[in-house]
């Protein structure tokens, strides 16, 4: 049989554990409420990409560049930097490529959004195709500023510039 003292110690242990669990629960609730409140009241819900963007990206991923060009031209979202960038990319990658058209759309994307990372990278690669190393390096410098802590687009264009230089 347990003594009264042992029973009292077990009861105290039980109460201590119960208190610790309640404390953890309350701290968790408090943290969750703070996280919930940290979102601004005016934050709009995340927008879903327009159908033309989803379709064009799928065509590009499947390397169906002519199809992507048709989808993008049908959407005719000329005021969108993404639209101009993807159309430029598709024109550059299709066979045969339309490099003049691609440049026009990259320039339009950058006029709308001067720090559009995709357009800066792809336009830089187009500059290399056209043997314009200074132009590619200027776009690389702009991309460096747009990517404060580094980004894939900067790394990709930097690698393309280095490969270009090693071939010359």
Where are these regions (language model features)?
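Terminal, low-structured helical/coil segments at or just beyond the last alpha-helical repeat
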Residues: 41-50, 137-168
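Alpha-helical segment of the N-proximal tetratricopeptide repeat
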Residues: 47-75
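Structural signature of tandem alpha-helical TPR/SEL1-like repeats
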Residues: 62-67, 95-108, 130-139
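Structural marker of alpha-solenoid helical repeat scaffolds
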Residues: 78, 112, 145-149
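TPR alpha-solenoid repeat register
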Residues: 83-85, 119, 153
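Canonical tetratricopeptide repeat
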Residues: 86-87, 122, 156-160
